[in-house]
Amino acid sequence: MKPAARRRARECAVQALYSWQLSRNDIADVEYQFLAEQDVKDVDVLYFRELLAGVATNTAYLDGLMKPYLSRLLEELGQVEKAVLRIALFELSKRSDVPYKVAINEAIELAKTFGAEDSHKFVNGVLDKAAPVIRPNKK
């Protein structure tokens, strides 16, 4: 699958996770509704589904990974920042096939696209501290 299709999968995952975090609907329903309503022509749909299910299933674990590196309470994070960080931490901790730098760079780009003005700096700061602990060999 092309890298662009993976990037689109991450973009769609941020949007769907944002919706899930706010609605707290079943993740399968959020996925179904998202795929029915959005143009997913250039999206790696399998990867999108894996990100959604992986983040939803591992939310407490992923939140635990980020908490030591947050400069504010988890509850005070914006929903976009939370979704972006959860995706990146899922990739870093559960997807060893995704290179360390790719997971971080993609998260920064997602934060620039969907987040508030400086959220990419915040996301970069958290991941810069968390990633070496999650992947000590930086691969």
Curated annotation (Swiss-Prot):
Gene3D superfamilies, per database record: NusB-like
The record's similarity note reads: Belongs to the NusB family.
Q: What's the name of the protein?
A: Transcription antitermination protein NusB
**Keywords carried by this UniProt record:** RNA-binding, Transcription, Transcription antitermination, Transcription regulation
Q: What is the lineage of its organism?
A: Bacteria, Pseudomonadati, Pseudomonadota, Gammaproteobacteria, Enterobacterales
Q: Record's Gene Ontology CC terms?
A: cytosol
* Cited Pfam families: NusB
CDD domains attached here? Terminator_NusB (cd00619)
**What GO biological process terms are annotated to this protein in UniProt?**
DNA-templated transcription termination; transcription antitermination
The UniProt function text for this chain reads: Involved in transcription antitermination. Required for transcription of ribosomal RNA (rRNA) genes. Binds specifically to the boxA antiterminator sequence of the ribosomal RNA (rrn) operons.
Source organism's superkingdom? Bacteria
Organism field: Escherichia fergusonii (strain ATCC 35469 / DSM 13698 / CCUG 18766 / IAM 14443 / JCM 21226 / LMG 7866 / NBRC 102419 / NCTC 12128 / CDC 0568-73)
Task: Give an example GO molecular function.
Answer: RNA binding
Entry keyword annotation includes Magnesium: no
